[in-house]
């Protein structure tokens, strides 16, 4: 039987793991759980530099890939600056809509972040988080 204490320990491990990954990539982004907008696995608030994650994930791989995806957004924000990143992201979303796609799902920055997260997980983290 699963005890409440075991569930709390798992959440703390997720929190620590997410913070460790953020630090590993040289970022200062904050990590918060339970504030994800819509049906996304996670989201990144580039104004406040906060990575928001769901409270639970079906498996560790989805959790790590979600964190890595948002880390890629944070890296782009750090590289471009908050204003330029927001401008470029919105322009890419509008371009996707003009082509008949979705602002978020067909955004080139979302596709790039997802590809980087999948590649980075396979290349670097898969063996460490089994």
Model-predicted regions and their roles:
Residues 4-11:
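Proteolytic processing junctions in secreted/extracellular precursors
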Residues 11-29:
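Zn2+-dependent metallopeptidase catalytic core
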Residues 23-26, 30-52, 57-61:
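Catalytic zinc-binding patch centered on the HExxH motif and its immediate surroundings
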Residues 61-65, 77-111, 115:
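Post-HEXXH active-site segment of zinc metalloproteases
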Residues 68-76:
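Short active-site segment of divalent metal-dependent hydrolases/proteases
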Residues 103, 117-130:
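Short helix/loop segments within enzyme catalytic domains
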């Amino acid at each position: 039987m699963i005890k409440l204490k075991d569930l709390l320990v798992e959440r703390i491990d997720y929190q620590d793991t997410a913070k460790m990954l953020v630090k590993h990539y040289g970022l200062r982004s904050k990590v918060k759980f339970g504030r994800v907008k819509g049906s996304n696995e996670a989201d990144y608030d580039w104004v406040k530099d906060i990575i928001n994650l769901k409270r639970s994930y079906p498996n560790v791989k989805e959790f790590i890939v979600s964190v890595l995806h948002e880390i890629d957004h944070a890296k782009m924000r750090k590289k471009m600056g908050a204003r330029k990143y927001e401008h470029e992201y919105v322009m890419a979303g509008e371009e996707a809509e003009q082509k008949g796609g979705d602002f978020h799902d067909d955004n080139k920055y979302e596709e790039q972040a997802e590809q980087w997260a999948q590649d980075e997980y396979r290349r670097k983290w898969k063996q460490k988080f089994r």
